[in-house]
Amino acid sequence: MMVFGIQSNWKHHAYGMVFLLLALIRPVPGLAEDINVLMSTEDFLAHAFDGQYQSNIVWITPSFRRQLEQAMNSSFRGARVRYWRNGNRSAWVLERIGKERPITAGFVVENNQILLSRLLTYRESRGGEIQYPGFIAQFKGASLDKVNRLNRHIDGITGATLSVDAIKRMATASLLMAKESATPQQVSTQ
């Protein structure tokens, strides 16, 4: 078929239009939220405590920030962190970026050891094995050694190295903050 002196293959143009339309309507990775909420903060706290707990704040002073960052081998943002306490038991809900998206995990610390750990929300598109209870259960009983590192080896997950590192950093931070929150704070009245 000749159109304006140019030979046109209508089938070629039709296929091109179909591919263009499919490209425009397909979901774009990263725009849709891949959020897997495994446990709410409220459910985690109910599991951590038998109903009674108080909300508290640990202040991140410059010297404590340096200690956190050195132990985590990573920066730490924020001036304060909310936590929950009943007696010697404290619960920490922390969030760190894995490879691309935030991961939310909860840690219960008692007597300078992790008593309970739970992955609360996982937003990454890869490394889904991190959501299995067997991975996060490795942190139970973990404490800090003399240089404020986890005292045990945590098995990684192929393809989820950054997510595993994020959870290890959160576990370390929860132990350090639990120790800091148990220390009486000097309050300046000036």
Outline where the language-model segments fall:
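N-terminal secretory signal peptides that target proteins for export/translocation
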Residues: M1-K11
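Carboxylate-rich, polar loop motifs that coordinate divalent cations or form catalytic acidic clusters
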Residues: L24
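Flexible, solvent-exposed loop/hinge segments and secondary-structure transition points
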Residues: L31-D155, T161, D165, R169-Q190
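Sec-dependent N-terminal signal peptides
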Residues: K11-L20
